[in-house]
Swiss-Prot record:
Binding site for NADPH: 10-13, 36-38, 122, 124, 202
Record function comment: Catalyzes the NADPH-dependent rearrangement and reduction of 1-deoxy-D-xylulose-5-phosphate (DXP) to 2-C-methyl-D-erythritol 4-phosphate (MEP).
Binding site for Mn(2+): 147, 149, 218
Domain of life (superkingdom): Bacteria
Name of this chain's protein: 1-deoxy-D-xylulose 5-phosphate reductoisomerase
Species, as recorded: Carboxydothermus hydrogenoformans (strain ATCC BAA-161 / DSM 6008 / Z-2901)
Family classification: Belongs to the DXR family.
Keywords, ordered alphabetically: Isoprene biosynthesis, Manganese, Metal-binding, NADP, Oxidoreductase
Length: 384
């Protein structure tokens, strides 16, 4: 019986993780749950899964719900130190990191040091601090990817040697604006950007998918997870979202992992690895889908993808800067403060404000803070 903590249980990945856990009551139990601010759903989840430790990042939500949780015998906490304590609870085997942003950074690092398994659904952690996390991780042992693309690559590489890999092909649906012209992209609305053609996800990642920044972040994550140089990682647009990624080998063979666009599949694969168990999820019917198509990404219409690849290749603090600036720019777009194409423009401006420095965790956290502040200033009209 694996004892799990879920950081981000009320979000899309967290809710689907709990669905998977419910399929296998004899294999998993939930020890603690953490959420940003949805106290109502968090309490429902705690009661349903008999959880006694809970966390709310938002202080106001914490104050609102503290007594209600206490009435049910559940200890509710808040603050970054308490989130870390949650991840390090005695007897915990693994942690699903599914809160977007860098809030999972310290819990991930300390949990790895403490010998726990990380089920990585938070790509920002690896993007911002890949250089620090890589020496601590053993892929397939103490860290398992949950992202569908990285799960696909991980599955395709089973039993293979990295020396045989010619190229990783990371697929992207192309988002809701795949066929839009640059002129059309100037005036897209938040509502339009949130209509992803294939996946049901949280707001932040849905906007990242619309700008293709998400694919850029995934390329950086793949670089660190699989220790593959950027020159060997290539994005490809695949509108049907059936092939989740491919690995091309030097002998000309290409291995692809296929499945319906349903995050419960890669979540289950990570949690039950190295075994596979039957479930009640719908399966893939290729004759119903009929056609699988592929296109090259357009870097002019989707500059965020190019920025991410450039930041990845530059290394050092640049992926962390990219990630932090993007988070603030996406927040601003969702709030109606900037236009869609301005997301990448803000990120580029912030990237241009930084120079390489000596890398450590403290530096990454400082850079993350500074990049966010600069992004807010650019959005507010300062430093034009």
């Amino acid at each position: 019986m694996k004892k799990l903590v879920i950081l981000g249980s009320t979000g899309s990945i967290g809710r689907q993780s709990l669905e998977v856990i419910e399929f296998f009551p004899d294999k998993f139990s939930v020890v603690a749950l953490a959420a940003a601010k949805n106290g109502k759903l968090l309490l429902e989840q705690c009661l349903r899964f008999k959880v006694k430790h809970a966390f709310l990042a938002d202080e106001e939500s914490y104050k609102t719900y503290y007594q209600e949780f206490k009435n049910h015998g559940i200890l509710l906490t808040t603050g970054s130190k308490e989130l870390l304590n949650l991840a390090l609870l005695p007897g915990v085997d693994g942690i699903i990191t599914a809160i977007p942003g860098t809030i999972c950074l310290l819990p991930t690092i300390e949990a790895l040091k403490a010998g726990k398994i990380i089920y990585l659904a938070n790509k920002e952690t690896m993007v911002a601090a890949g250089e620090i996390i890589t020496p601590l991780m053993k892929l397939g042992e103490n860290l398992l990817p949950v992202d569908s693309e990285h799960s696909a690559i991980f599955q395709a590489l089973r039993g293979e040697k990295l020396a045989w890999v010619k190229k990783l092909l990371i697929t992207a649906s192309g988002g809701p604006f795949r066929e839009y012209t640059l002129e059309q992209l100037k005036n897209v609305t938040v509502a339009e950007a949130l209509k992803h053609p294939r996946w049901k996800m949280g707001n932040k990642i849905t906007i990242d998918s619309a700008t293709l920044m998400n694919k850029g972040l995934e390329i950086i994550e793949a670089h660190f997870l699989f220790q593959i140089p950027y020159e060997k990682i290539e994005p490809v647009i695949h509108p049907q979202s059936v092939i989740h990624s491919l690995v091309e080998f030097y002998d000309g063979s290409v291995l692809a992992q296929l499945g319906l666009p349903d995050m419960r599949h890669p979540i289950q694969y990570a949690l039950t690895y190295p075994e596979r168990f039957p479930n009640n999820l719908p399966g893939l019917n290729l004759t119903e889908i009929g056609v699988l198509s592929f296109e090259k990404p357009d870097y002019e219409r989707f500059p965020a993808l190019k920025l991410a690849i450039q930041a990845g290749k530059a290394g050092n603090i640049y992926p962390a800067v990219l990630n932090a600036a993007n988070e603030i720019a996406v927040e601003a777009f969702l709030a109606g403060k900037i236009k869609f194409l301005e997301i990448a423009q803000i990120v580029e401006k912030v990237l241009n404000c930084f120079s390489p420095v000596k890398m450590d965790l403290e530096t990454i956290l400082e850079v993350d803070f500074r990049a966010r502040e600069l992004a807010r200033k650019f959005i507010g009209g300062e430093h034009q």
